[in-house]
């Protein structure tokens, strides 16, 4: 949360006449109904204010007073004089895209339930949240709109969504519908996004908001590696710990668009929502947008991130594992790739158990009968164990593995598998039987990527097949972990609305399976972090953050990902060196410390290739990871120094009650003839006393204002310090 000591005293939702105020700990979000036009006008989104807000004086230019593109609007339309990016575009039966929604009524509802529309969303009871529903009508077209605002005061957060209902007698087409559109009166802002590609996701990009529209998003059918459905607005002077920051995060896993527009008048508009819609809305039907989370922070970018992290852990992620420690795992992929069978997997499990690993994950290569999955060009869709590799099926192997005792533990080994149910290889029995189940556009060639095609998740028969196939696997053996992959984008979509329909079908499958198997740890993956978004976190409590397991690259990726997402949702592994993606060699401890910054910690290697010293050191590193895991999973994060700005990136996790902490401090490259690097902590109490790895006690003021010095030697140094309040 933004300020752990602050207490909100205003009602979360206050209505005075037709002025609406949403209040948080340090947040005010206000808008009103313009009396002449019944249009919703934005007043303020920022720090707490009280009392009336003066109406903005309209600029006076001969003949142009009162033009719609010169005022701040809450639900801006298209075609009636506002030439900025609209919040929606509806093609009417007559062919035009003119709409005129006017305020009709409002309702205040305690709490917030997950949407019944099939989309993921936040939830909370009356103590956590209050929802304002504003209803609008277009008297010329018989269309109705609802804008929903849920305020979570503790997190200085407003969650917005929109819906359109067709009350006319003709079809209309929803060509776009933003989940949120907000106008700021400021003209000197900067925007921060997360850009990247495969194996280099979530790299920060901070740039000036200049005149015109700056737009980014995804057209791949999933949120993608290229851009994340998140953007922050900040003042040029805002830092990690000081200044105002606004964060916008879309609860959606499909194609999306974020527009940041600075108008000729110096107003700044942010709109965010799904893209590639073109959704036909028949009479009596309603179309719902995804939800967008809007966070305000008066304590810098770090405060914004902590609000998002807390909200997502408590009010978005439904899995019980969202706030529980995850077992240390070993994934077979980089150790064995496709070269797996029952003997190799049992040998891997034995060696993992001897190291103290609690969970063995069998990655790709275990399935396919007539088309064995011995490479990536066959087998997807045929979810039965390969009889040549697993002649007795999975159940006996799983029973043998789960009977293994883990060294230095009272627990037995657990077992997990990799799947990619949304895909199919042309070389598979499933495709031969159901070629019509894949996305395709008439007679056009079906584009393969990674030798695979995409199943049409909007089809009920496809959904039922996946639910049945996955349920059969999980019912047949004691499998307690599933890594769910998604390795390509959507192509040859059969209709303009197919991308959104695909996501609705996928969400239904996720919901059914995670509800049916609540004791399974579900991990999302899309060639790494290609679908790391709030929508997926509703169902899967963790995501494989990147296919790049190089520790140096992972520092940038994990620091970037933490801008919007909690460490509890990240997966990080110790892999072998030289690293398989970069060829870089880094020390074991450095690799381990980087991976420990994730809620799911593990190894991705073949233990048979470990050196004697690595074999001796890994059990202690596993024990350390398990010791700090409750703080990383449940605690709050302070990014003390960013890898983009410093040779010594650092981060601090503090427990919820602020009595324990873990400091991560890294050196990327040596610096000759230079004073020892110093790190100043944050989030402590000035007058409290703390011990650092047992030394001290030191005052919180000393640790925050002077800090600690550590010595490093050579490339890729790391320090992990345990902090405890007396």
UniProtKB/Swiss-Prot annotation:
Catalytic center at which residues?
485, 547
- MF terms in GO: alpha-galactosidase activity
Question: Which EC number applies?
Answer: 3.2.1.22
Query: Which keywords does the record carry?
Result: Carbohydrate metabolism, Glycoprotein, Glycosidase, Hydrolase, Magnesium, NAD, Polysaccharide degradation, Secreted
Q: Which GO terms describe its cellular component?
A: extracellular region
Question: Which Pfam families has this protein been placed in?
Answer: Glyco_hydro_36C, Glyco_hydro_36N, Melibiase
Q: State its role.
A: Hydrolyzes a variety of simple alpha-D-galactoside as well as more complex molecules such as oligosaccharides and polysaccharides. Not active on paranitrophenyl-alpha-galactoside and raffinose.
Q: Indicate what this protein is called per its UniProt record.
A: Probable alpha-galactosidase G
User: What is the name of the gene encoding this protein?
Assistant: aglG
